[in-house]
Amino acid sequence: MSFIKSLLLAAAAVASVSARRGPEPKYPPAAGTSSYCSYWVDYEGDKSCSRVLEDNVVVLKDFARWNPTVGADCSGIKAGNSYCVEAFGEPEPIEVTTTTRAATTTTQPTATTTTFANGIATPQPTQSGMVTNCNKFHWIAEGVSCSQVISFQKITLADFVKWNPSVKSDCSGMWAGVNVCVGVVGSSTDTAKPTTTAPSNGVVTPQPTQPSMVTNCNKFHWIAKGVTCQQVISYQKISLADFVKWNPSVLSDCSGMWAEVQVCVGVIGSTPTTLATTTTTAGNGVSTPLPTQPGMVTNCAKFHWVAKGVTCNQIYSFQKITLEQFVSYNPTVKSDCSGMQAEVQVCVGLIAGTTPTTTRPPTTTAPGNGVSTPQPTQPGMVTNCAKFHWVAKGVTCNQIYSFQKITLEQFVSFNPTVKSDCTGMQAEVNVCVGLIGGNPTPTQTGNGIATPTPIQPGMVSNCKKFHWIAQGVTCQQVISFQKITLADFVKWNTGVGSDCRTMWAETNVCVGV
């Protein structure tokens, strides 16, 4: 799993869909946590241990191994601690054998022996053109890169390509869903030798590295997919100037930083420049974290970091302020939010609690119903609405009704012009997400099971167990986590296709009938 694991929407955080996740822990890690941990969940006690595992697509065995304070029955998880949910590069505790992929009705056939009587059982399927004297194998899950394989197996790229020629020197030919060779019979070159940054400097440099990295580096940071310069320098408490000096090819705007390489975050004999905070105006007593949104007011007392992909609506909804207040604190954001920059601090509260009044006056949906309706609204919205949601640009139907814990059917019944496929939903309007007197209960299917929506096209009608497909999740992760076969998964969700290439993200799939 990459740093991805994709960042949650701030709006989802408000609803406590799951705890905050990220490449650095917010809370103290539990004692004995794996030193290989590359992704964390900050546990606040609002979910069960099993829900934490499901939300992060982690099995209990791995979770307990990475977090020794967690018991084999998922006991021992405590609020106020950060727990590891990914440990990239950690050696497997049990040697992989050919019995791990038993013969089933899935597309993965029973392991067979290789030819030429070398006596080594070769798990199937394999990378095309793989050598016949292989004695060690690695399963390529979807999304895994050459760099991850050779780093984890401690082999060189040259050996990897030699043993798997069809992979090609640039790794463009590596397949997903196959076994590749990572060791051969009688080979003494199956372990990559670590290199030093410069002769006799005494520092071992992990590979691969960012091109043109300085030779006197003594501290390194692995760049997972999706990680930004700002996250690295903030976590390492170094300045952007030092980071670029030690990694020149990154460039001053960080556009040259590679993913899945080591970068330098400290050098021999150097005390790195630390990132200092400044005050917004001399004498106001408030420290302002940098960098900030251009034109931000000088009397700001509360700040919010704008991660890539975050919208205005997510910020002011999470901070419980209005769009008008947000724009008045950060004028260059503009009323349509087109001017908001990413990876800067924005102001979300003023000194002494000054709060500009909203410029969007409420009106009532109909005379006498007693509910004030914020304007503008989705055309055709029902007149007995009691709860509203502002639709920012780029927000989808699914994000709204999932956040509000209602069904698609309810959402469309409250806002008919949205249409069942959501093509009619307008941006920058208020939609209805709750009625006066409460919402009607969702309609159950004939089997008595309420089916969450939206669903994967082609899902069977007798499904009893469902799994939400977050962005970036693969079929392999789902079937491994749910302990089902690929054949059953495809049978219950015919729309995913036999090779799972048409599985939709942000839908529910069937994992039990």
UniProtKB/Swiss-Prot annotation:
Residues passing through the membrane, by range: none
KW Repressor (keyword) present: no
One Gene Ontology MF term: chitin binding
Biased composition (Low complexity): 357-367
InterPro entries reported in the protein's UniProt record: LysM1-like, LysM_dom, LysM_dom_sf
The keyword Chloroplast belongs to this UniProt entry's keyword annotation: no
Disulphides: none
Ranges where the LysM domain occurs: 38-85, 136-182, 219-265, 302-348, 387-433, 465-511
Region of interest called Disordered, as start-end residue ranges on this chain: 357-377
Family (UniProt): Belongs to the secreted LysM effector family.
Domain notes: The LysM (lysin motif) domains are small globular domains involved in binding chitin in eukaryotes. Vd6LysM contains 6 LysM domains.
PANTHER family assigned to the protein according to its UniProt record, in alphabetical order: AM15, LYSM DOMAIN-CONTAINING PROTEIN-RELATED
Role noted for this protein: Might have a role in sequestration of chitin oligosaccharides (breakdown products of fungal cell walls that are released during invasion and act as triggers of host immunity) to dampen host defense. Does not play an important role during host colonization.
Extra remark beyond the main annotation: In plants, chitin acts as a microbe-associated molecular pattern (MAMP) that is recognized by lysin motif (LysM)-containing plant cell surface-localized pattern recognition receptors (PRRs) that activate a plethora of downstream immune responses.
The protein's name: Secreted LysM effector Vd6LysM
Taxonomic path: Eukaryota, Fungi, Dikarya, Ascomycota, Pezizomycotina
